[in-house]
């Protein structure tokens, strides 16, 4: 396997280094995916906090030793033996990691506080007080619990849920948590049925006598015991002192006593028995009974700590008991000959231990003893004339090197001095060619002399042995032993008698006549032996009392459980509730019961208030006869209008202009017929339902009223927009906007060409300037007009009379404006797609008595076709109808049963009307709660939340689909609760295809199979123009079934309705029975869904899975007004620190090689989806220019090199920017809605309305313009003076160019995307000079806003931003909201222009100048002279316009003001498209995404965050104020810029960065909150304090900053 993995890695590296770009990209992607998987796996490791202060080397040591944990080193606590103390927590977690979670566990000598903090309620700690140190340690554990509880109390918190059981157990039965008995004497036993039992021993094993260990384990029925002990292998080899350098500890042995202590520390020593330690090391079997033994197995060695486990073994399974284990007889008798009891015991152990019979195991567990030998040393005493012997451990190669060398000496040269000289020479360092080379063997110099004597004696004896063997052997008259002694005497000379005694005594030479007799008398005793500490009384260690804290926590939990039944309990302020209970000294449980009783009206106290929603206001108002008449009343700006005054007066305020309407009040004058609608004044249609009305009656009646009003509002919006199209006399062109058409009666041509023809009605403008509605008729294809008609406006909403006819018929069913509530029984059939509505119910409907209603004509035709397939005509136009058909042409007939298909797509009031009109006894409403619901497309009309739920009597669930194939059915499992089954025999049906653009599709060259479906109406019209027939949108075919479906997406703009959770995607995927193919121009979530479904294995297609994600509420730290202290940031680190931090936050970006991307794009074939434009291909090849080399950055970031402008580069930028604008807007009455939005804008952001109404006249005047001109530069005035003003300037013509430097994104998109350049669309200098004064004056006017609550970031310094956010109250919990809008400038359309135009008008802008500005932002022409491109754009914000910045700021403020309750905002800041808002926590916000899509055409996402992010800066709060940090990651990205021309340019960059990032030089907070804020945005971010220090270091030093860039590239 290792060989295969090596081959794969080598092949992958070869692929990366190859020349094939595609293979390189795939290989890099594979390496990236592998790295991501590895990092994700690391993040899943258990997390451990290491608070002790240790060195960097020790940090690396700990990290490498414990790879199972994700360790965070805080270095915040100085302590004695910091490394060993911190390792103790890691060692405990490692031991507990081996134990199955929840299994009963004994911790021998353990830390019960550590287990309480981890919530382990299954651990019992045996904590005997064997010495004073144990008592001290146990008191410290109780102190840690006290500190923890006091910290919770100080912060008004309770014990967390995961710790409650453990703390309850300690409070109720402390002896079950810990006892003062030894493990052998412990009497605590878990329940018998609690499963296997375990034990852990952390540095406590040596305190248990070895002969008691097995019996103690079996008495607790321990299955496995895991132990960790500190051990030095040299201690087993008669060493009297051994140092453990890694943890700074020392073992010291004196006889059988072993002391353990830490160097240079005054802490008490640990004492153990040497024999006990030795037994635990050398024994493998620990007998527990005649049958059971515990077998020891070493696990791992980490930082001087040995881990092992003792496993319970039943020896009867091996057919032998422990007593039958025999001993090695040779070792046994050899041991008996030795008089030392210690050696005899050791020999007995050698017969049992299995580990030392395996050389590999010995080398593994004793790595330092590998290739080491024990050599005796001889030392003589001058005074006593005696010689002593000791032993030393040296390297085996060293010994044989010395012996082999000196064995070559001649007899005369073999002296002690020569041997010592050679040993010293090979031990010393050697200098070779001026370089010092260290000796291979590290032998202590102190033992070289006695060691040389040993080598000398061994060589002498070996030489003597050789002489005896090789010499001629003669006995003569001496015995053999005498001859040998003679030879030995000749060899050693005069020292022979002493040497003889020593050799015989040490068994180097042995004779039979001398017997070994050793007697060791007790010569002395030590002072320690005389010191005896006796205890006269035994005391139990008292337990810590935590009952009070647990009682408080229990009471709070009970109180919150009681309060959870209240409506809106998720918004309950727990902190205020706790403060109230504490201030009033009342039990939380009692207070909660009182609150619930009051809320449920069980206390005798009636609440006179409720949340003023539409639902509650409707309940509070009484129904009176006067409410049937709703009138319109013009209101002045001084009158405060609210929904309560509207309901009381029965009048509606006129929000828009009256268009000449003089009556103060208009009674209900509904149009009785279509004839009344013909030539009706537009004012009578527009001024209907322009404000939110509080409805009365039952909920069904309220829904029906709302539906009628929504039809009127839709008609009003359509007529209003048509009137606006007729008033826009400038800019008509035949290249229309598709939705609206304007016919010029005089010229007999379309000024704006509509997408379709044959409109039923429209709005007419006559020569007198009056506008009225008209019913249209045709003679052939020509529209019939009258002589006084000037223009006719139509739209896609005027094709039929639907809304008009519906209003007419529904009002006829109402009596005095009150609809009748339907009395029929209503049953909701909630079924999955294809659940068999037709097969199960529709096939059994009665021809004469039942009625089936469907949304569209296609569905009605399908049902009729199926019902009549047998030849018998059962379904007709009378009993199978569309919803619109029944509402527009009701027939006076009652039905027994009513079937409404896709009823949840309809307005709830519409469903109620259908039931009422049909006169049925029971109504079955078929729908799918997961598919597309009813969408309110009239954005200026309210559709309250409580109206969305259909009121039914029964709900029937259906979870079996007869339509969907197996792969689609698998997709449905994640959408519905419960199992979704299918009866389809088709397993695989979905596929996708990428197309190069809409130009690829043609009905002849590329026919599409089956039903053709699109997501948007724009794509539908595009396909119809290309010749495709029978095309519908997804919304239109909901509820229908087809064998084959072709789904087409031609819009490259991101669509919010295409997502994994979108109901549109669900509907699109569930319309087919056989095949489904998706044609798309971009990769989107639906492509990913299809890819995932295609890769499923066959057996998975029959499985189901339902998962629900958890929601978390983000909270933000509170602050209060104050000031920031200044503490200089340390200047440390180097550029590798910056590179490391950048790679961690944005992994893979630094590996992108983008130097030749622009060249590659020019050389390769490109498929571009281009809108209408004119291209000059003569400029496709740019002129070669000499480019001066730029400075090369040392840091590798995603920064792109500068690009040269050209046809291709500019065209790509224009396609991705200007041609990629979203089209999401629904039906809007533009002028009326803009007026309402601007009203909210001024009401929300300005202190008083009078402030900007009274000062307008004195601002936009000639004098004010002259004052502005006095402050302008002479160059601008000269340009204006020389300009020819005989005619209006070309206000609608703009120039186009691109920025040479692409904008860096702080994401990973650079790895798979060619970033488009930013476009600049700008006016001429003369036009900018004219409009510059207007922009400046409007900026001054906007200073009238409420500066305490809102900040418009115009000419503000970072210090002013910081000051603005410094007064937030730290005691008020807040939600930080950030609206992220993509393509902000390009999304702005006619509605945005109307809003901005209305704001400028109210600020006093001259009418003529305002009209000039408006025409300059409507239909505009763009010319790019460098690239040779010309195109036309409708609206869109121009990036080079003088009003761009102030206009964008105003639009984002108006947008948020129209969607969010700005009266409740705490703080808000706006700058261009950036915004950040602070609201009180717990507010209910509307559907921001839907409103932003349908009203503002914004692809927006609303984020709730903990920290604010505004204009590239993090807003960090603390208890003394706020600090605004420039985004460090953005700053580091700029340090990798590749467009720096020279060092002067580089210095300008440094000064600029110093100005914006000055706050990084203040270290008063130490950057922890900044790290948390960055982590909130970049999930892979780590603690970046080291990088921030490094940034500050480089920015503060001009010359050091230069080292980040190299001269030349």
From Swiss-Prot:
Q: Where does ATP bind?
A: 834-839, 866, 962-963, 1071, 1092-1095
Domain (+)RNA virus helicase C-terminal, chain residue ranges per copy: 959-1111
Chain ranges of the (+)RNA virus helicase ATP-binding domain? 799-958
Question: Per the record, which residues fall in region Helicase?
Answer: 828-1080
The EC designation for this entry is: 2.1.1.-, 2.7.7.-, 2.7.7.48, 3.6.4.13
Q: Which family does it belong to?
A: Belongs to the ssRNA positive-strand viruses RNA-directed RNA polymerase family.
Annotated organism of origin: Tobacco mild green mosaic virus (TMGMV)
The reply on keyword Transferase is yes
Tell me what else is known: This protein is translated as a fusion protein by episodic readthrough of a termination codon. When readthrough of the terminator codon TGA occurs between the codons for Arg-1111 and Gln-1113, this results in the addition of the RdRp region to the replicase.
Region annotated Methyltransferase sits at 50-453
Q: Which residues does the UniProt record annotate as the domain RdRp catalytic?
A: 1374-1487
Keywords in alphabetical order? ATP-binding, Helicase, Host-virus interaction, Hydrolase, Inhibition of host innate immune response by virus, Nucleotide-binding, Nucleotidyltransferase, RNA suppression of termination, RNA-directed RNA polymerase, Suppressor of RNA silencing, Transferase, Viral immunoevasion, Viral RNA replication
Q: What is this protein called?
A: Replicase large subunit
- CDD domains attached to this UniProt entry: Virgaviridae_RdRp (cd23251)
Enzymatic reactions: RNA(n) + a ribonucleoside 5'-triphosphate = RNA(n+1) + diphosphate; ATP + H2O = ADP + phosphate + H(+)
Q: What modulates its activity?
A: In resistant plants, is bound by host protein Tm-1 (e.g tomato Tm-1 AC A7M6E7), thereby inhibiting replication complex activity.
The alphabetized list of GO BP terms reads: DNA-templated transcription; mRNA modification; RNA processing; symbiont-mediated suppression of host innate immune response; viral RNA genome replication
Q: Subunit structure, per the record?
A: Heterodimer of a large and a small subunit. Both large and small subunits interact, via an ATP bridge, with host protein Tm-1 (e.g. tomato Tm-1 AC A7M6E7 and AC A7M6E8).
Q: Which residues form the Alphavirus-like MT domain?
A: 72-281
The GO terms this record gives for MF are: ATP binding; ATP hydrolysis activity; mRNA methyltransferase activity; RNA binding; RNA helicase activity; RNA-directed RNA polymerase activity
